[in-house]
């Protein structure tokens, strides 16, 4: 038998017989379920799926995303699913949590970088000292209360009490600005004085929290005890802050300005920027503070107005928030143990600490409101908003847990407290803060009541750039003069997405939009502003103020109506949700835009018009903009009777007086036979007949010597004869624009038999007929609805505060965020 000692050993094999030089990777292993990479992919999928499901079910409850984030983590805590055998073996085994934590921390670094990147302090200008006082007093009260509450659940380790108290107190006092802004946007409070004060106070609180957190990390070492290298750590941290401000910020700006050609930023710039995040994070880690500090400071160092900011946000935001950040929430949940805490801390003690956590900022803010002469209900609302927590609170807690300054009990207790605080903020605000709706009394809510030689205030809305040309040409046709000018408020409606903060930003030379729009949206906003400005420049009778309204589609109609009320508009002009294609037909359109139009028409504080643009953007109309073209513009007004038709007649009448406008008013009169067979429709017609006769008589009397006006009456028996008469009009004349009344849910003898065929409620019977495929004409159609208080929801009569006085309509208006602050009486606008 051969001597075992004499046996040769293969150098390519380990002592366990594994072939070292041919060791298979995790992706190609024979048992893939035990490899790290497949486990990580499983964890990533489970984390994302869980977060999305929780967020989907919590969103209707008006809870912020932070609640879903915490619940996502707690779901996999040891108390819930963390100790489940299947979860431990197949999803979150202990030996593969290191890779999970690595990617979670990397996601956190880049997420904090995006927070710094999106924090533009110029966005909110603090005019007075009120928000600063509220922020400082609230933060100090939270720090003191946090220090006291720290000793109630558990005393912690004796040598780490100071460090634990610091982390606990800072996390207790922080406020999350992005979630606070989202809550204000959902409740339509962004433009109120209370909302402005709360956002300013949140910004101050965030900055103070960052300063305290940075210095706290420098004071205590990684083991949770006093840092013996404190002087060097503080000096190096301060030096890095100064380096970012005086070297990195101007250096990055210089590099971008000298390497970016033609406004095009290449991927190389983005990759170098992302590498800079890692480098700065490493530097602050070496300095003795958390790595996220460097990422945050580097984000602040990127030039605010440079296109690189938007590119990085577009590339990172959705991927981080939707893919990688749920891993961080899972890590937070795995560190919490509710069952262990329940065995150590009584339920009563937990209730005391949680209740105190909620009340401390509310009480301190209400105390400040007494001395600052702010209504107590506003102080209650601001105090509730200051309790808004977010990712920063979890970051502070995890930093304390990493250093062992916070034990499992402390960590779990404060995590649950944050969950409760975030859950009660929005419901408490919605219940306790019910600001009275501003009801401005003004007479000219309709064009019919508008005096000819006074200013006509029109609120126009556009969704996309193609909507603009038709609307501007219609405004030009509206005969604006110095004696009867048009004051136009043009709104570009932009959907509020996950990475934008809702606000109304006035776009002029002094205040360009600073919200982080995508490049396409911002460029489109600039082009829209330029086109409306051109309308103003080329006509002395037009004043234009262009606004970008960023809000969710679900509440966009409320923004339009509130702004119309604020500006005392007497006419809202909306684009039809379908656009004309190259072959002259209307496309399928946008169903969401159609819903917005219908909601505006139901709740508008003034008259509304919907423009179906089918040719007003052509050359023949565009040449009219510069007053060098004298081609006649043929306009037809179809009068069937009713308040909407009288309003349409008033708008068409306003166009009279221009050399190039030829107006034809066609009144459809029911025959005696039609009145007999119409039944109830005839009764309704007779009620309005006297008022219709007066309007027609006044129009004919004042335009009888005007050769540009033609009045025609046609006697018809039913709706079918009305359609036939309209077809004959189109055969004998080529009209550029039809103006009709909506006449919604009103059947007259001249429209009998057409109601069942009305497929477009927002256009009415005649408007729907004019744009149908049965008509070969390509004329545009303006459908007008007259304001009627009876048509508005009766709920608007409740909880209203009458406000006398005229709203600001100056052309040189200031941003809404800088409106005058009335210390005597705070008046707010809010959707019910």
Swiss-Prot record:
Classification via InterPro entries: Cation/H_exchanger_TM, CPA2_transporter, Na+/solute_symporter_sf
Ranges of biased composition (kind: Polar residues): 792-802
Chief subcellular location: membrane
A GO-annotated cellular component: plasma membrane
Cell wall biogenesis/degradation is among the record's keywords: no
Keyword check for Cell membrane: yes
Mutant lacking the gene: phenotype: Mutants display a reduced rosette width, a later flowering time and an altered leaf K(+) and Na(+) contents. No defect in male fertility, due to redundancy with CHX23. Chx21 and chx23 double mutants are male sterile.
A GO BP entry: pollen tube guidance
Family: Belongs to the monovalent cation:proton antiporter 2 (CPA2) transporter (TC 2.A.37) family. CHX (TC 2.A.37.4) subfamily.
Protein's UniProt name: Cation/H(+) antiporter 21
Gene: CHX21
């Amino acid at each position: 038998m051969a001597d075992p000692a004499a046996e040769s050993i293969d150098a390519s094999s380990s002592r366990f017989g594994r072939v070292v030089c041919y060791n298979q990777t995790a992706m190609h292993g024979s048992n893939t379920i035990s490899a790290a990479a497949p486990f990580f992919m499983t964890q990533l999928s489970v984390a994302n799926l869980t977060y999305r499901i929780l967020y989907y079910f919590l969103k209707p409850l008006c809870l912020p995303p932070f609640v879903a984030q915490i619940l996502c983590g707690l779901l996999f805590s040891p108390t819930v699913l963390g100790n489940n055998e299947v979860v431990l073996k197949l999803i979150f085994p202990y030996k593969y949590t290191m890779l999970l934590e690595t990617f979670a921390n990397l996601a956190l670094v880049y997420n904090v970088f995006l927070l710094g990147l999106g924090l533009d302090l110029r966005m909110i200008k603090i005019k007075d000292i009120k928000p600063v006082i509220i922020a400082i007093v609230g933060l100090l009260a939270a720090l003191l209360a946090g220090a006291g509450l720290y000793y109630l659940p558990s005393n912690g380790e004796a040598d780490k009490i100071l460090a634990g108290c610091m982390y606990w107190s800072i996390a207790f006092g922080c406020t999350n600005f992005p979630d606070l802004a989202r809550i204000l946007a959902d409740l339509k409070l962004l433009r109120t004085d209370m909302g402005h004060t709360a956002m300013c106070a949140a910004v101050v609180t965030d900055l103070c929290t960052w300063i305290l957190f940075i210095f706290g990390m420098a004071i205590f070492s990684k083991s949770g005890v006093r840092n013996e290298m404190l002087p060097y750590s503080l000096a190096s941290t301060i030096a890095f802050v100064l380096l970012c401000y005086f070297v990195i910020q101007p250096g990055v700006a210089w590099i971008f300005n000298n390497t970016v050609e033609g406004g095009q930023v290449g991927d190389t710039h983005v990759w170098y920027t992302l590498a800079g995040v890692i480098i700065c994070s490493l530097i602050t880690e070496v300095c003795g503070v958390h790595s996220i500090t460097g990422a945050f400071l580097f984000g602040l160092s990127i030039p605010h107005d440079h296109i690189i900011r938007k590119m990085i946000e577009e590339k990172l935001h959705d991927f981080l928030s939707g893919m990688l950040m749920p891993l961080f929430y899972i890590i937070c949940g795995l560190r919490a143990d509710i069952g262990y805490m329940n065995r150590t801390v009584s339920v009563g003690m937990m209730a005391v600490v949680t209740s105190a956590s909620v009340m401390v900022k509310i009480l301190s803010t209400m105390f400040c409101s007494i001395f600052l002469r702010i209504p107590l209900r506003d102080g209650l609302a601001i105090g509730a908003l200051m309790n808004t927590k977010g990712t920063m609170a979890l970051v502070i807690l995890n930093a304390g847990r990493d250093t062992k300054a916070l034990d499992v009990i402390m960590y779990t207790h404060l995590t649950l407290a944050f969950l409760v605080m975030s859950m009660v903020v929005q419901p408490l605000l919605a219940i306790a803060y019910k600001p009275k709706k501003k009801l401005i009394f003004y007479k000219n809510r309709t064009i019919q009541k508008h005096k000819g030689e006074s200013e006509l205030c029109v609120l126009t809305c556009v969704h996309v750039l193609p909507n603009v040309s038709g609307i501007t040409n219609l405004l030009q046709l509206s005969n604006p003069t110095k004696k009867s000018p048009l004051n136009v408020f043009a709104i570009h409606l932009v959907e509020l997405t996950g990475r934008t903060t809702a606000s109304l930003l006035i776009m002029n030379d002094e205040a360009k939009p600073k919200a982080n729009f995508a490049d396409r949206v911002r460029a489109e906003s600039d082009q829209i502003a330029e086109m409306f400005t051109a309308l103003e420049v080329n006509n002395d009778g037009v004043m234009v103020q262009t606004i970008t309204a960023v809000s969710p589609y679900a509440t966009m109609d409320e923004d339009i109506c509130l702004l119309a009320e604020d500006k005392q508009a007497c006419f809202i002009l909306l684009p039809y949700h379908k656009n004309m294609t190259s072959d002259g037909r209307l496309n399928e359109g946008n169903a969401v835009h159609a819903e917005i139009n219908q909601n505006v028409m139901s709740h508008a504080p003034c008259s509304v018009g919907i423009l179906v643009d089918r040719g007003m953007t052509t050359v023949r109309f565009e040449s009219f903009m510069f007053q060098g073209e004298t081609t006649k513009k043929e306009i037809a007004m179809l009068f069937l009777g009713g308040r909407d038709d009288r309003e349409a007649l008033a708008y068409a009448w306003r166009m009279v007086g221009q050399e190039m406008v030829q107006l034809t008013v066609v009144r459809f009169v029911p025959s005696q036979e039609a009145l007999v067979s119409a039944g109830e429709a005839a009764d309704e017609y007779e009620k309005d007949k006297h008022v219709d006769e007066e309007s027609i008589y006044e129009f004919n009397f004042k335009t009888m010597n005007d050769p540009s006006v033609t009045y025609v009456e046609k006697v018809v028996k039913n709706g079918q004869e009305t359609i036939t008469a309209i077809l004959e009009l189109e055969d004998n004349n080529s009209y550029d624009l039809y103006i009709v009344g909506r006449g919604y849910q009103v059947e007259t003898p001249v429209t009998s038999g057409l109601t069942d065929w009305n497929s477009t409620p927002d256009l009415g019977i005649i408007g729907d007929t004019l744009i149908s495929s049965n008509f070969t004409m390509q004329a545009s159609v303006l459908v007008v609805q007259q304001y009627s208080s009876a048509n508005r929801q009766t709920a608007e009569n409740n909880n209203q505060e009458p406000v006398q006085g005229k709203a600001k309509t100056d052309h040189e208006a200031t941003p809404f965020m800088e409106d005058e602050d009335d210390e005597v009486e705070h008046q707010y606008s809010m959707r019910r």
